[in-house]
Amino acid sequence: VPLAVALCLVCWSAPSSAAEPKEATPAAEETKKKAEEKSPDLATDLKVLNQVEKQPAAVQELYKIARGVLSAKPEATYADLAQDAAFQRFCQENRLTHLGGPMLGSLSADGVKVWVRTVKPAKVEVAVDGMAKAFGPVSSTAESDLVAVVPVTGLKPGTRYTYRVLVDGQPIAMPEPAAITMPSDAKAAKTRIAFGTCPHRWGLGNSKQAELIRSRQPAALLAYGDIAVQDRYSHLGLHRADYLMRDCFAAWRSLVCAVPVYVSWDDHDYFGNDLAGIPPGYTDQNRRQVRDVFRSSWINPGCGSGEEGTYFRTRIGPCDVIMLDTRYFRSGKKGSYLGDEQMAWLEKQLLDCKGPFIILSSGTMWSDYVSGGKDSWGKCDPAGRERIFAFIEKHRIPGVLLISGDRHGARGFRIPRPSGYAFYEFEPASLGARTGPKVSDPAWKDVQLFGIDKQYAFGEFEVDPSPADPEVTFRLIDDGGKTIYELKLKRSQLTPPGPDAGK
């Protein structure tokens, strides 16, 4: 099978200007050196590439060639790869025109954006069945990391469209499921949204899980931490190599060509385990460069109130979705978990939301039950968390659903408040079936909803806005299709009580 068939990410932003790097202390340099020694080597990466399903020989050869180029220097780019003679020869022999995509994202009322990474600078177009003209062309360039993002507009709600991608005028091989399905705008229409964290690269290759998510026809997939990059610190070339591995997985390609994906990061996507802000031995410039590679590799709607971090708000069907950045802004100082700008932005967005439900993500757990809040709100910024919770209660903001990740396994909790109200937290950090902290504890019996470990599972919200009191159903579903846990909540149950409650 030609590799072009076998290989059947939004917007890139130019690197920001950065502050002058500070001189690193010997202790910081030693910490940095020890941390980077934990970055996976080639043998480990090949094991991960083949862990769930063995990849075709041509895919493995492509990955080895590309990783060799991208690992050679910390600043290595896809433009460097495009100029490599062995890579050029491989692409020619295998008729390879693109390295990643098509990936859907950034839904709007009448369209979606399509992300493609080419093997060399090229012009990319998207042809939608039933449309007279193709969308584009958009150029992939060395400056864009060979990414082209093509806006597709003029689509009707509740309608499914097949589409094709053309690179320099030639149709590329497309995964069979490739289609754009616009959410319905009918007030009574149900909407599903899939979500989860911690595939840690190999989970992206689980075809059973990917096909099950796609078959349930969610309007979108929310992936918010430890997704495709594993502890690459400031080595930008290896960050890029990990995103190439993501796009080598047929399971991933078949999912995101049909389901729009929205992402935020956690520690392993960022620098390394439990790292945040500007880690010891690194600079603000390193932090910004890692952010730029992340942004170019996905297709989010944009970034909050400025160029810093990765947070954003969007609308998916009847739901408002707010995805926070709980890594970039931390400084160790009180209130820095989100930073002043992101916190003020969040409060403004919460007041502005109009849908029956608000999905609010944190890369780390909202509650302190697991690991005592280690590397999360409980240890780093309990006052910041209290500010958010108290703000929601004060303004009686309805329908807030907390989603989180980081601690491997999947758990759900009620978070009781002094007012008698309780937030609900859903944490399906199980896209990679990794082992993690304990999944249950007798001390949690009054607050825990569910807990599993060492098995693939994803979360799903099904929103029904048609009742007078709109409903949302949460499901935790394993990769065999079994519903492990299900809970239906009414909007009224997710509405904080009035000011006299609890007196």
Predicted regions and their residues:
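A general, composition-driven signal for non-globular sequence regions
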Residues: 9, 16, 26-28
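Boundary at the C-terminal end of the N-terminal hydrophobic targeting segment
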Residues: 13-21
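Metal-dependent phosphoester/phosphodiester hydrolase catalytic core
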Residues: 26-503
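General secretory precursor processing signal
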Residues: 11-14, 201
